[in-house]
Amino acid sequence: FSVACRSYVCDMGDFASVEKMFAQIPAPDILINNAGISYFGLLSDMSIADWHTVLNTNLNAAFYTSKLAIPHMVHEKWGKIINISSVWGNVGASMEVAYSVSKGGINALTKALAKELAPSNIQVNAIAPGMIDTAMNHVLSEEDISSIIEEIPADRMGTPEEVAHLVWQVVNSPSYMTGQIISLDGGWI
């Protein structure tokens, strides 16, 4: 592949940190918003700080990076923004209310921003993975994971490689495809 990728460490939920990171990189033509954390538990037990941490990392970070990347894309009249959402952004999940809200916000951001940027030939889409075999899902017990897998018609969790492959496909998708929330969930939801 003829792709240049860079990685930086910063607090994605803090605009000043994201702005500092953007000052160190060339303006991106393709932006993949993939920052994500979860909180598992009852909303009534969740602290205000935890709520803000989840929303800042999952939703505000996508706003910050998009805000900083868009001027270059508009100037070039070309760009792709791919937001990583979740099936919980489509249907919500008990015990993961903040995560569901943040991913629902990602879906709304994707749809609205796609309409705003389409005249500039910038496509904005989201991928909504289901249960993917990542560290974030391994906070669940083996019993809970097995129970969820029983509900998935594909009878397994997805892999990070499958998500990456779909991201690559969306990057290379036709310019007429914008504002889409694409589920990758093994037929689960």
Where are these regions (language model features)?
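Short-chain dehydrogenase/reductase
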Residues: 1-28, 39, 49
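Substrate-binding pocket helix/loop in short-chain dehydrogenase/reductase
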Residues: 42-43, 50-55, 148
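Active-site helix of classical SDR
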Residues: 66, 102, 110
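Alpha-helical segment proximal to the catalytic Tyr-Lys
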Residues: 71, 115-119
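C-terminal substrate-recognition "lid" of short-chain dehydrogenase/reductases
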Residues: 78, 156-184
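Residue(s) in the substrate-gating loop at a strand-loop-helix junction
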Residues: 86
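Short, small/polar-rich loop/turn modules that mediate ligand/substrate recognition or access, typified
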Residues: 118, 123, 177-179
